[in-house]
């Protein structure tokens, strides 16, 4: 049924202008459409997109979008240069501990988490070979 469908993350924003500035200016995504509701569509890699819409305050305590990257250290360095602050976690029950904002999970994955201007938790991740 949905095995060939493209998934599009949908994120809330209290201040759509502020969110747009972050996603365009800080993350480098391109606005590819606007919705009068109001909302914006942003182009991500490999033909994927995000939809961000304005709504009253809301919070999520989990990752809502993860961007797959080839070099997590280089991406984290560039995002830090642009003012992004990475979260630090130490969760022994999950075997999860960040070092300088990046967690290595076994021998298969690295991830780093940060918040957008609206409090949504985003991540960059790299599969390890």
Region annotations inferred by a language model:
Residues 49, 66, 111-113:
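Short hydrophobic/aromatic beta-strand element in the GNAT-like acyltransferase core
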